[in-house]
């Protein structure tokens, strides 16, 4: 066995406590911003395949055409992002045994491969159960839902996911859902939604109560698998992942967790809808192309976002900070984005629309940082317009410089405030420094932070296959 030693810097963890799962959610948050979504990829498929194994690994390119590569994931890190959110479907086409919620081994292997790409690039990963054909995010909140049966399916599913990924270090986070109460029903749905998505009444309170029942099942299932999962940071979702509804209705302290300070909250941001997502004019309003102060002089007022919308976003984020971050629950903005459009000459100028889009990404990122919220830009790999596509995956390049520059303008403006909320954590609290161990036996890890061998006094006395390992803070190459 030939051993080659080198300082482990390029792909090393930011903090040795990550390997020992010793960081709190707030300490981990220091390293995570900004984030990016591998959208329309691992969550793709058809819900006619729910609870079957008909999706296959080819589902990765069902909604966009590029297979994810190590080179591309490395480029995400080189471009300044520190985290990747991986939306994943498990039930929608990747279940081999419905009774036990067993996941197709080939699918698990492919998801692991992409997680490994991220670990090798020292990116933090948020791995979730996305809309997933609506099996729970819609069907679990209907008037006819068998809640007990859904809970048992959820417990089995997250037990299987957690066991498959339990050896990864603290750079891997689990998120129980995506947007609970949002999205389409599956073919198996019974009844209608139990609440009015646009109303606020007792039925909405009942919805939040049921949501937290499911979230408790998620937390308990992951913790029960033990190992690194006993202290892994977990992410729970606010109702509809909506700012206002989460601020008003979601009491995160109702969730219990055997691990102290290891919970984060998730919300999403596509507001205002008329600027970010509306595709065509309606009788109640028109698509907004420009932001106030960034519109051409000849633009119709009906095409310009009132600046009060910006103030409302900032206010809502600060309320989230008060209600959650200041109480020890960091927040991820799991998705945020606005459509970058092609503007007809009759509607104004393209340059002013581009400027407005950049401005939106800039202040959204900045305000998130100032509220202790970790933002993850949504990206679908749709290279046409309108889109929310930051990168061209096949070309391994930036697709939309306007959006990219807006994100990092906000990163620059908000970084000082963010670091004040989440200061750099100690590297020694809870662990001994490697150099203090002298000749004492220590552990060997692979580059993804997974334990390979423990109580190793000398590498000469342990059998390692060819590969790259971490031992006493150094990279070890076995050839």
Give, region by region, the residue ranges found by the protein language model.
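C-terminal outer-membrane/trafficking sorting elements
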Residues: 431-479
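Catalytic domains of carbohydrate-active enzymes, especially glycoside hydrolases
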Residues: 67-89, 319-324, 365-367, 374
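Aromatic-rich peripheral "rim/lid" segments of glycoside hydrolase catalytic domains that contact
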Residues: 343-433
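Active-site region of glycoside hydrolase catalytic domains
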Residues: 148-307, 318-338, 370-371
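Surface-exposed, active-site-proximal loop segments in enzymatic domains
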Residues: 47-58, 90-109, 133-150, 182-201, ...
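An active-site-proximal structural segment forming one wall of the substrate-binding cleft
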Residues: 17-18, 63-84, 94, 98-131, ...
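N-terminal carbohydrate-binding accessory modules
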Residues: 12-83
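Acidic/histidine-rich helix-loop elements
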Residues: 38-68, 96-103, 146, 274-310, ...
């Amino acid at each position: 066995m030939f051993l080659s030693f080198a300082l482990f810097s390029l792909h090393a963890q930011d903090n040795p406590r990550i390997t020992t799962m010793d960081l709190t959610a707030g300490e981990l948050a220091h390293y995570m911003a900004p984030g990016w979504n591998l959208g329309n990829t691992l969550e793709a498929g058809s819900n006619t395949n729910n609870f079957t194994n008909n999706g296959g690994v080819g589902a990765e390119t069902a909604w966009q055409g590029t297979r994810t590569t190590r080179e591309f994931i490395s480029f995400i890190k080189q471009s300044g992002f520190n985290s990747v959110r991986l939306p994943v479907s498990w039930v929608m086409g990747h279940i081999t045994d419905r009774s036990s919620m067993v996941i197709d081994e080939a699918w698990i292997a492919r998801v692991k491969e992409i997680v490994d790409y991220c670990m090798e690039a020292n990116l933090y990963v948020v791995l979730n159960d996305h809309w997933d054909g609506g099996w729970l995010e819609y069907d679990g909140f209907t008037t006819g839902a068998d809640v007990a049966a859904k809970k048992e399916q959820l417990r089995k599913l997250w037990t299987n996911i957690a066991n498959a990924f339990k050896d990864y270090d603290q750079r891997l986070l689990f998120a129980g859902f995506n947007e609970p109460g949002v999205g389409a029903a599956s073919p198996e749905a019974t009844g209608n939604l139990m609440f009015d998505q646009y109303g606020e009444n007792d039925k909405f309170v009942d919805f939040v109560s049921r949501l937290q029942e499911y979230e408790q099942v998620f937390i308990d299932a992951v913790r029960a698998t033990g190992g690194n999962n006993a202290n892994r940071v977990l992410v729970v979702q606010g109702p509809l992942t909506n700012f206002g509804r989460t601020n008003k209705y979601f009491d995160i302290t109702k969730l219990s967790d055997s691990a102290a300070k290891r919970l984060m909250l998730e919300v999403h941001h596509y507001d205002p809808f008329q600027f970010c997502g509306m595709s065509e004019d309606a009788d109640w309003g028109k698509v907004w192309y420009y932001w106030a102060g960034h519109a051409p002089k000849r633009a119709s007022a009906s095409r310009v976002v009132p600046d009060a919308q910006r103030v409302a976003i900032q206010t809502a984020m600060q309320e989230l900070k008060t209600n959650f971050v200041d109480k020890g629950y960091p927040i991820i903005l799991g998705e945020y984005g606005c459509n970058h459009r092609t503007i007809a000459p009759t509607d104004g100028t393209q340059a002013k629309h581009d400027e407005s889009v950049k401005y939106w990404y800039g202040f959204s990122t900045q305000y998130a940082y100032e509220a202790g919220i970790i933002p993850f830009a949504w990206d679908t790999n749709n290279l046409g317009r309108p889109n929310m596509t930051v990168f061209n995956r096949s070309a391994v390049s930036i697709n939309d410089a306007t959006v990219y520059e807006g994100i990092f303008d906000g990163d620059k403006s908000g970084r000082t405030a963010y670091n004040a909320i989440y200061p750099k954590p100690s590297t020694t609290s809870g662990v001994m420094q490697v150099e203090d161990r002298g000749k004492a036996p220590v552990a060997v890890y692979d580059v993804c932070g997974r334990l390979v061998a423990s109580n190793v006094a000398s590498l000469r006395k342990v059998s390692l296959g060819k590969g790259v390992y971490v031992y006493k803070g150094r990279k070890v190459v076995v050839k």
